[in-house]
Amino acid sequence: KIKKNNYMRISFAIESIHSYSLIHDDLPSMDNDDYRRGKLSTHKKFNEAVAILAGDALHDLAFEILSDIKTHPSSKRRILIINELAKTLGSKGLAGGQSLDLLYENKIISTSKIIKMYKMKTSELFSFCCVAPFIIANKNKKEIKFAYDFGQIFGLLFQITDDLLDEDQDFKSLGKTPGKDKKQGKSTLSSLKNREKIKIFCMNEIKKFENRNNKYLIKNHL
């Protein structure tokens, strides 16, 4: 059982990372967006230097929170979570995925490469959100693997949906500038497939997840 203080501190750390990633994502050298959540993005309201430093501070705050004994008395579990977060944000996770996002602009990219990019820049963080409480609760490797796998499919579907919303929603709905992916030549699944094919793809991915985790789902949730 996880105490409220444990999961609240993990939540604070995750939100710090989320906010850092959005601030840096909006920078002129990245996605160059003037708005976030219906308000001026950090670099527009203040300046680019402040935005970079604010993002850096929020990034570091997450590790400060997770390393504190208040998060959990077991140093081993805290180290495991910190290690997991470091991998999530590094070259095989968020940072690597964002670099691919920039590299793939105005290029014809295969579906498999786009999905890999989605998983790196989005799914890895979703997986961390799912795995961290399992680590704190001292769950076994199979249970942690299930949590990771769930985060992967959840993050993938979220990113696909986010790209679709960018195409057909307005500023009021999104809280940011719509249609930027197409204008910037972003490689997205919707740039390769129509809506019906994307729906089929998503349903197949869900089915794969269910098949991989069928025994766990039946044992623990039915």
Regions found by a protein language model. Give the residues of each.
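Mg2+-dependent prenyl diphosphate-binding active-site environment of isoprenoid biosynthetic enzymes
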Residues: 1-214, 220-221
